[in-house]
Regions:
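Structured catalytic-domain cores with a bias toward divalent-metal coordination
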Residues: 1-125
């Protein structure tokens, strides 16, 4: 069975059999440099499940980042069926600052499912 429905993430369309890196802009630093998080999407031509690998939900817990990186480098993230999405660093703020929390002092793991009008961490969730 072939995959027929395109996948849309952040207004980017990923077709069956396609690979794409989407850079999600999440903020601007005081230097006006854009802060982006890469989302690596690999799709098979065949239908199947969608699997998401993430790491660094807490910015000071970085071991998972290397695991996700190895999945990508070794091409383990190329699915035979379905879609694999990799996000090596979720909490880029905490990662840069070597801290668990977002700049607003909140633990991202405690604000799911989030809110469009909430704190920075809540909006991100």
């Amino acid at each position: 069975m072939t995959a027929t429905k395109p996948l849309v993430i952040l207004k980017e369309t990923i077709l069956a059999g396609e690979s794409k890196t989407i850079n999600m802009e999440i903020a601007k630093l005081h230097t006006m440099n854009k802060l982006k998080i890469p989302i690596i999407v690999e799709r098979s031509k065949l239908d199947g499940p969608t699997v998401l690998f993430t790491a660094c939900l807490h910015g000071d817990e970085i071991n998972g980042t290397e695991i996700v990186r190895q999945l990508i480098v070794q091409k383990i993230n190329k699915p035979k069926r379905g879609t694999i999405i990799c996000i090596p660093i979720i909490n880029i703020f905490g990662f840069i600052n070597k801290t668990r929390e977002f700049p607003d002092g909140r633990d991202l793991n405690r604000v799911f499912p989030g809110s469009k009008t909430g704190s920075l961490a809540s909006r991100f969730a």
